[in-house]
């Protein structure tokens, strides 16, 4: 990609809070003078992309519910081909960083940084791979790809203690937006 790519994903199937974290990270970067764009596959939508999401003309059936939610005041590109989407963002000259929502298992786009988000109440479940468990990839292999881990909510399973000591770990908490 022509600009840095920060991948936000998780090692387990199901919700861990990745999308709200991507929204928060976008807003933090923008408030510091960066011009991020979000790259999403558009799960659940019919658009194959690359398509810039416009809430005024797109709906969840077209671009997916998460990209539509993220596009509220943010630049979001849906592209099933993540590498092509990253090129479109980078070559546009407007954005200086790409936030890839849920792309840890995509081997076609190099990441400058990979952030893993984990649900503190769920951890890694039974620790088994899909279909016997929730893991998308073997645990050691997935953890080796991470540059940073976010535990969303209270670490009820003790998963944080199992993370490598060299991996920076931060605790986060989802709060409803009152605005």
Regions found by a protein language model. Name each.
Residues 42-167, 178:
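Phosphate/Mg2+-binding loops and adjacent switch elements
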Residues 1-5, 11-12, 78, 156-157, ...:
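Proteins with a high burden of low-complexity, intrinsically disordered sequence enriched in S/T/G/P/A and R
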Residues 171-173:
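ASCE RecA-like P-loop NTPase motor cores
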Residues 1-58:
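Walker A (P-loop) phosphate-binding motif
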């Amino acid at each position: 990609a022509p600009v840095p790519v920060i991948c936000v994903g998780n090692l387990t199937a199901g919700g861990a809070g990745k999308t709200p974290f991507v929204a928060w990270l976008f807003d933090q970067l923008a408030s510091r003078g960066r011009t991020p764009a979000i790259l999403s596959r558009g799960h659940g939508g019919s658009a194959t992309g690359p398509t810039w999401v416009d809430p005024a003309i797109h709906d969840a059936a077209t671009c997916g519910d998460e990209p539509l939610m993220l596009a509220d005041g943010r630049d979001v590109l849906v592209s099933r081909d993540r590498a092509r989407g990253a090129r479109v963002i980078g070559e546009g000259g407007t954005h200086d960083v790409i936030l890839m929502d849920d792309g840890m298992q995509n081997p076609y786009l190099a990441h400058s940084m990979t952030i893993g988000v984990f649900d503190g109440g769920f951890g890694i479940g039974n620790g088994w791979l899909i279909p016997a468990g929730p893991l998308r990839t073997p645990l050691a292999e997935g953890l080796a790809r991470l540059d940073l881990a976010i535990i969303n909510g209270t670490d009820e399973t003790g998963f944080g203690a199992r993370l490598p000591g060299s991996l920076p770990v931060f605790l986060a908490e989802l709060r409803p937006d009152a605005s």
